[in-house]
UniProtKB/Swiss-Prot annotation:
This is UDP-N-acetylenolpyruvoylglucosamine reductase. Belongs to the MurB family. The lineage of its organism: Bacteria, Pseudomonadati, Thermodesulfobacteriota, Desulfuromonadia, Geobacterales. Pathway: Cell wall biogenesis; peptidoglycan biosynthesis. It is found in: Cytoplasm.
């Protein structure tokens, strides 16, 4: 099956196609077994052609951005991992709006908006990864969330391209519901006009906060658990006595207890075992059930 699929991909997809690609190369945790295929479509039309092939052949697939907020199990992913890395359009529109491709890095977007005097997404400067990944999880910080600034998102599926206004989206805290077979390829944002110097000051403040509280020094996926309503996950983990707790090469950060870090040689199984230990300890100590913010895929 893989050889037949490979032949079709090579014949009909213009982007880069890698076989048996270790996902540890494409995730910020630096763990994860091989994907059968790792495909980076050349543009949105190429993405549509790829999705048509996968639908026709019944091939499982997974869309990724910058590989943050993602854990692939050690057995890898049986199917196709799709990267949006080449969806990098970035343009200012009339009316303090900007249209942004899913593959644009969050830091690049905040720098562009600052230079254009457009405010409202400064908090993204401290969130690693891409705009597509940020949209898919409704990323946020410092009281802001990315979908609050969206006018519409552009998605692609087997039926083609679709624009969805924010009022039609089902979203919430670290959550956006997408339809099966649907991938975000871009979004239009509505922003505020402001002096670039004031925007820079806010960006600097966000970066300073991140450096002081989240500069953990080892590969990580950012916050591993969601904050329960009215509570901070890091505090619950701290109170359970787990600062510095370790399973194999995976460790609860000494700097920020909601960050699990790869101290070297970690496996996905190490992170999963450590996460299970944390959930059990927090439940026992506080009665609170933690839920992973990191998305987990793949085979054991």
């Amino acid at each position: 099956m893989n050889d037949r699929l490979a032949a079709r991909l090579e014949a009909e997809v213009r982007g880069e196609i890698l076989r048996d690609e270790p996902m540890a190369r494409h995730t910020s945790l630096r763990v994860g077994g091989p994907a059968d295929f790792f495909v980076t479509p050349a543009d949105p039309d190429d993405m549509r052609a790829l999705l048509a092939i996968l639908a026709e052949t019944g091939t499982p697939w997974l869309a990724v951005g910058g590989g943050y907020n993602l854990l692939i199990r050690d057995g890898g992913f049986r199917g196709v991992v799709i990267s949006s890395a080449r969806m990098t359009s970035l343009e200012r529109l009339e009316g303090n709006r900007a249209v942004v491709g899913a593959g644009v890095a969050n830091g690049r977007l905040t720098a562009f908006l600052r230079n254009e005097g457009l405010a409202g997404l400064e908090f993204l400067c401290g969130i690693p990864g891409t705009v597509g990944g940020a949209l898919a999880m409704n990323a946020g910080a410092h009281g802001g969330a990315i979908l609050d600034r969206v006018e519409e998102i552009l998605t692609i599926g087997t039926a083609g391209f679709e624009c969805k206004g924010r009022e039609l989206l089902d979203y919430g805290y670290r959550y956006l519901k997408l339809q099966p077979g649907e991938i975000i390829i871009g979004a239009t944002f509505v922003l505020d006009s402001d002096d670039p110097r004031r925007i820079s000051e806010r960006i600097d403040g966000c970066r300073a906060h991140r450096t002081a509280s989240q500069q953990v020094g080892f590969p990580n996926a950012g916050s591993f658990f969601k904050n329960p309503p009215g509570q901070a996950a890091w505090r619950l983990i701290e109170d359970a006595g787990l600062r510095g707790a370790r399973v194999g090469g995976a460790q609860v950060s000494e700097v920020h207890t909601n960050f699990l870090v790869n101290r070297g040689g970690a496996t996905a199984a190490d992170f999963l075992a450590l996460a299970a230990r944390i959930k059990d300890a927090v439940k026992l100590k506080s009665g609170t059930a933690l839920e992973e913010e990191v998305k987990i895929f793949g085979d054991e």
